[in-house]
Design a protein with these regions (language model features):
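Glycine-rich beta->alpha junctions and the first turn(s) of the following alpha-helix
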Residues: 2, 7, 73, 189-287, ...
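A short core secondary-structure module
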Residues: 145-189
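A short, Trp-centered hydrophobic/proline-enriched beta-strand micro-motif
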Residues: 111-120
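Glycine-rich phosphate/pyrophosphate-binding beta-alpha loops
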Residues: 73, 85, 124, 149-154, ...
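A structural signal for short hydrophobic beta-strand segments in well-ordered beta-sheet cores
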Residues: 133-136
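Internal helix-loop-helix
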Residues: 42-112, 153-159, 300, 349
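Glycine-rich phosphate/cofactor-binding loops in nucleotide/flavin-utilizing enzymes
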Residues: 87, 332-380
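C-terminal helix-coil-helix/basic helical segment that borders enzyme active sites and/or dimer interfaces
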Residues: 20-28, 263-267, 283-316, 329-337
Length: 380
C-alpha cells in the first residue's frame, strides 16, 4: 500500500466515524467544526500536498481529489472548510518567504489556525478582475482597504491569503496577493452568513480598514498574483467536482441499501423496474463524472494545462449532482427527509458547488472559448 492509498483509507475511516455522525450536529449548531478539523489534522489531512520538509505528506493532486470525494460524501461544508485550510498551508510552504512559511505552516498543519482565500467581493465574483479592495504603497509596506464577501472559513479563519488591486483600472494586471493576519489591527470580521444546510463551510466576509501588510507579506506582486489565482482555481474546480461525485455516491449507497430493506406491494423496492432504473441512471452519470475528474486531476498533477478539463469536470459533476440528488432523495420517499440521512445537506452542497470557483454559466463561457484549441481525442 502506498502513502496515497493509506491516506485514502484513513480519510474513509475519519468520514465514517467523525464527519457523518457530526455533520447534522454542526449544522444544527450553525458552526465550523473546529474540533473535527483538529482531528483531521492529526491524521495528516491538512498536510496532504504540503512538502515533507515542512511536516506535510508531500502527496500529489490525484490523492487530493480522491480524499475530496471520500470526505465530500460525508459533508460538503466540512470538506470545503478543511481543504481551504490545507490550501493555505500548501501555498505558504511553496510560495511564501521562508521565514513567513516557517512561522505559519505548522499552525495550519496542526489545525490550531484556520486559513481562507479571499478573492470574492460583493460586486466581484466570477469576474475576479473587477475586485476593488485596494492595496496602497506606504513607507512601511502596504495599506489594505476594502471588503471581502462569500469567503469559505471567513467566519473564523485566522490567516487569509487576500487579493487586492494596486492600481485602479488595471484589472487583473494590477492585482497583488498578500498574507493577512486576522488578529492584527485593521481586520474587521463580519457576522457569518446563514447558509441553509452548509454552516460548516463558515462562509462570511470581513473588512480591511487601514490594515498594514509588510513587504514580506506580499506573496505575489502585480502581474503574477492573477495568474497564480487562476491556477489555484483550476485545482479547486476539480476537487469540488470530486466532492459532488462523493455526495452522489453516498446518496446512491443510502438509497440502494434502503431499496433492499423497504418493501412495497409485497416486494423490495429494488424489484420495481421504475425504481431501479432511477438508480441505474444516477450510477451511469456518476461514472462519467468520475472519469472527467480523473482526466483533469492527472493533468493538474502533471503540470499540464488543465483549464478546459477542470471546467468540464466541474460543470458536469455539479449539474449531475443537482440533477441526481433530488432523484435519489425521491427514491427514499419520506424517509429521505430525516436529518440523519445526507440528502438535505447534500442538496444544499450541490447548489453551493454550482457557484463557487466559477458559476456554471462562467464555466460554459470558458469551455466555449477553450474548446477551439483543445486537443483531439486521437491526440490528447
Amino acid at each position: 500500500m502506498d502513502a496515497g492509498d493509506d491516506l485514502s483509507q484513513r480519510a474513509q475511516a475519519f468520514a465514517r466515524h467523525v464527519v457523518r455522525p457530526g455533520a447534522p450536529r454542526w449544522e444544527a449548531e450553525r458552526r465550523i467544526a473546529r474540533e473535527a478539523i483538529t482531528a483531521a489534522a492529526a491524521i495528516g489531512l491538512t498536510g496532504l500536498e504540503v512538502p515533507v520538509a515542512f511536516g506535510g505528506l508531500g502527496l500529489g493532486y490525484r490523492v487530493k481529489a480522491r480524499v475530496a470525494e471520500v470526505l465530500g460524501a460525508a459533508d460538503f461544508g466540512f470538506t470545503m472548510s478543511l481543504l481551504n485550510t490545507h490550501n493555505i498551508a500548501a501555498k505558504l510552504a511553496r510560495e511564501a518567504p521562508a521565514e513567513l512559511a516557517r512561522r505559519h505552516v505548522p499552525e495550519l498543519l496542526s489545525g490550531r489556525r484556520l486559513g481562507c482565500t479571499a478573492l470574492t467581493e460583493a460586486g466581484a465574483g466570477s469576474d475576479f478582475g473587477a475586485i476593488v479592495t485596494m492595496a496602497t504603497r506606504t513607507a512601511a509596506g502596504w495599506r489594505l482597504d476594502g471588503a471581502k464577501a462569500w469567503i469559505t472559513n471567513a467566519a473564523e479563519a485566522e490567516l487569509v491569503v487576500l487579493y487586492a488591486q494596486t492600481e485602479a483600472g488595471r484589472g487583473g494586471c494590477g492585482i497583488a496577493c498578500f498574507l493577512v493576519d486576522a488578529a492584527r489591527p485593521g481586520f474587521v470580521r463580519e457576522p457569518a452568513f446563514a447558509l441553509t444546510g452548509q454552516h460548516a463551510i463558515g462562509a462570511g466576509g470581513f473588512r480591511l480598514e487601514g490594515y498594514l501588510a509588510r513587504d514580506d507579506e506580499m506573496l505575489h506582486p502585480p502581474g503574477q498574483a492573477f495568474k497564480s489565482a487562476l491556477r489555484s482555481i483550476n485545482g479547486a474546480r476539480v476537487y469540488i467536482a470530486s466532492m459532488c461525485n462523493g455526495m452522489v455516491g453516498e446518496a446512491l449507497r443510502v438509497a440502494s441499501d434502503y431499496g433492499l430493506q423497504r418493501r412495497s406491494f409485497g416486494r423490495p423496492l429494488t424489484e420495481h423496474q421504475g425504481w431501479r432504473w432511477r438508480l441505474a441512471e444516477a450510477a451511469t452519470e456518476l461514472a462519467a463524472a468520475r472519469l472527467l475528474v480523473a482526466q483533469a486531476a492527472a493533468r493538474i498533477e502533471a503540470g499540464a494545462d488543465a483549464q478546459l478539463y477542470a471546467a468540464q469536470a466541474k460543470l458536469f459533476a455539479t449539474r449531475m449532482a443537482e440533477r441526481q440528488l433530488p432523484v435519489l432523495a425521491q427514491a427514499m420517499g419520506a424517509e429521505g427527509l430525516r436529518e440523519h440521512h445526507p440528502f438535505g445537506r447534500h442538496l444544499a452542497g450541490a447548489r453551493v458547488a454550482g457557484f463557487v470557483d466559477g458559476s456554471n454559466e462562467m464555466l460554459l463561457e470558458r469551455i466555449a472559448a477553450l474548446q477551439r484549441t483543445a486537443p483531439t481525442l486521437e491526440n490528447p
